[in-house]
Amino acid sequence: MTEDFYIFSCSYQKKVVPLRCNFKQINDMAPIKRTLQALITERMQPQKVMLLFGARRVGKTILMRQIVDSFKGKTLVLNGEDIDTHTLLGKASVSNYRHLFEGVELLAIDEAQHIPQIGSKLKLIVDELPGIRVIATGSSSFNLQSEAGEPLVGRSSQFLLTPFSQQELSAGETPIETYRKLEERLIYGSYPNVTLFDTYAQKREYLQDIVYAYLLKDILAVDGIKNSQKMYDLLRLIAYQTGSEVSYEELGKQLSMSRNTVERYLDLLQKVFVIYRLGGFSR
């Protein structure tokens, strides 16, 4: 049995070099409007939860804050990594949530996957607080999607934020600029911060930093994932086969791993948005 996989990644070297960026250049840049902003805003209705997924560093927090800033009404922004947020939401009762969110029309929770039982808590909030809207972001689908899935059936919409699309980038450049940057973007991708660096070396270093500091962090924290080197080796192998059919058995033989372990690792990589699976077409 074979499957197609598409991977976005960088060179898997272990050396990570601190980066220096021209912050004046960043501050002077006009913000690139994300196409999802209008879609999320349109669907953001009372008693509904907008779930925004995406890999780390693709701009979920910025997009969430842009949506909050443009909202005409009372808003509240919480950080799911803040222990105070856990304390506030810990007592899952109608009286507590009515007290906390009285008058709030838009509740935004960043990195919501860190909050225990987030799905049932969001369900209670939208069911019992008339007029409230919720937007929650998550850097992996391990907790947020699994916990929020069943409790929020019929109450939520899910969105996947990717690095900048060419459509988004083209809005601020001429066709000639787009043509000149095409090869660079095909090689280094379009993570928001990558587009700010001037040299290829800086882009490579930043991508390496993302891989080791962010993208694989969630995977290696999962119980049972002990051999990080095997994970890196698997990523190298499928990176060489981007857009081609891959065999679980063949990958397992090359890595001295069982087929089940290969499938499990690939499933985990997909859940943190390191790879995208493209199913084959059968006649």
Can you say where each PLM-predicted feature lies in the sequence?
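Accessory nucleic acid-recognition modules appended to NTPase machines
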Residues: 200-283
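Conserved lysine of the Walker
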Residues: 60
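Short glycine-rich substrate-engagement loop in P-loop NTPases that contacts/grips substrate
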Residues: 76-106
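N-terminal pre-Walker A segment at the start of P-loop NTPase domains
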Residues: 8-41
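Short regulatory helix/loop adjacent to the ATP-binding pocket of P-loop NTPases
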Residues: 142-158, 173
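Hydrophobic anchor at the beta1->P-loop junction of P-loop NTPases
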Residues: 52
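Conserved catalytic/switch belt of AAA+ P-loop NTPases
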Residues: 119-142, 150-151
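Hydrophobic positions on the alpha1 helix immediately C-terminal to the Walker A/P-loop
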Residues: 63, 67
